[in-house]
């Protein structure tokens, strides 16, 4: 919370609006409760209210701490900006009363936002992630510690030292997990974070929203140094835990 207060004060001193990525607001509120002095006796809902009081708005993916399978929202405290957003919404998603979402999904989000700040739920969710992290540690699988509230990150670079970084060890681990066990995860490394946007590297196109056919080379023409500046990224593989889905037996 102290970090949020400091950033909020700095932004306001320069007249800069502060917007939160609120997709995991409840988990953040829980960690503030259990880790930060002065918050142990406050509820996650109360802590969340304080967090948002320091901002000017937020974006929210309800697939995370909305406990829904689709949807989200944009919240602002500026009526002029809100009016502009409504006009954009009308031509892209629909009326503000539903924003392109079905009634069922709106109801799921409404229920989810209430349930996600319940202490029993947050204790279970964060504890479940820690349970999986502890299993990895016990089996000498290198992970990022301490674990957070939604996923465990395997250090694929350390786990697979025989695979050079330019050959994407985290990507390789993801493929192997899916082939062997049907386990889906996400590479968080050079392929996702590489700065060679729109370039083909070892036959793989790095992530970019502006890809031009001229950016792609024949595999035989690849420059051995094209990825040199990207291999400094950690090679991680994320195993996000679906909420209220698995038991400890599944994790074992």
Residue ranges and their predicted role:
Residues 94, 130-252:
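Conserved C-terminal alpha-helix-loop-beta "cap" of PLP-dependent enzymes
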